[in-house]
From Swiss-Prot:
It comes from Rhizobium etli. This is Uncharacterized protein in rpoN-linked probable transport protein 5'region.
Length: 54
């Protein structure tokens, strides 16, 4: 299938199926048979919502 790309600032996630739960704001990304590809920026910070939960 077609690849799906999810980005959060400089961080990029690539898979084949993206499910977003609108009520919780959480997203699930499924792979294309192997692993989800992730490119993380080591300098990136968690978003404000994640910081409040910790």
């Amino acid at each position: 299938g077609n690849k799906v790309i999810l980005s959060d600032g400089p961080n990029v996630f690539t898979g084949c199926k993206l499910t977003v739960h609108m009520q919780t704001g959480q997203a699930e990304l499924e792979s294309c048979g192997g692993r989800v590809q992730i490119q993380l920026d080591p300098k990136s910070q968690p978003n404000a919502q994640q910081q409040k939960q910790n």
